[in-house]
Swiss-Prot record:
UniProt protein name: 5'-nucleotidase SurE
Sorted UniProt keywords: Cytoplasm, Hydrolase, Metal-binding, Nucleotide-binding
Function: Nucleotidase that shows phosphatase activity on nucleoside 5'-monophosphates.
GO function term, MF aspect, one: nucleotide binding
Catalyses which reaction(s): a ribonucleoside 5'-phosphate + H2O = a ribonucleoside + phosphate
Note on cofactor: Binds 1 divalent metal cation per subunit.
Family statement: Belongs to the SurE nucleotidase family.
GO terms for cellular component: cytoplasm
Amino acid sequence: MRILITNDDGINADGLAALERIAAQLSDDVWVCAPEYEQSGASRALTLAEPIRVRRLDDRKFSTTGTPTDCVMLAVHELVKGRRPDLLLSGVNRGANLAEDVSMSGTVAGAIEGMALGVPSIALSQMGFYEPGESFEPAEAFAPGIIKRLVELGWPADVVLNVNFPNRPVEEITEVEVTRQGFRDVHVRHAERRTDLRGKEYYWIGFRQERSSPPDGTDLRALYEGKISVTPLHIDLTHQPAVFDLKGKLGGAPPKV
């Protein structure tokens, strides 16, 4: 099995090294293409206004000046030689990708690009990393078995699997739950205003560590309960009930003011 791995934390990220070790347990044909610099929050951005530079680090390892989406597209079309990857793994992200965050995640976007190119794709993230020295031990302990089982089972061609690991001792993690995407009832993103040495204001965008109250069956609830969450996602954002509702009210001749 040929595996391509990418991430959004950058080529030197500890999570990418962890994913290389995970992939090595599943195959001896592992390729890496990841951003030269951190691209967290890049979502499905493409680099269109400037050229993308590629740095070859090894026979099967590359970094690029582009986004995770750029990396996957370049790897599949240009850099991975001989035949296409059989599986794409994106991560392991430093911090969970849950609920509405998946629409901003470069990690999930890398997997979506793989899916769009016809490669079965899995995004992997681990909760936590609020303190120095935290490791990817939970992901490294459980990801190989989960990935192997998912590959054996298969999944629809238009689906990306979003896997999130809790950040707690391995011996306390005893369950995998297949979940739906949740939605927070609190706002965790915020802008922090600061002032530079010249008296000019600037901002850092960040996240508050505030928990919501998600219902059972969601990715958020599973992680809060210390479970591994596996969420099938797809790129079709259509809200079918709203389509059916609006068809009866807006279809036909365009309305006038």
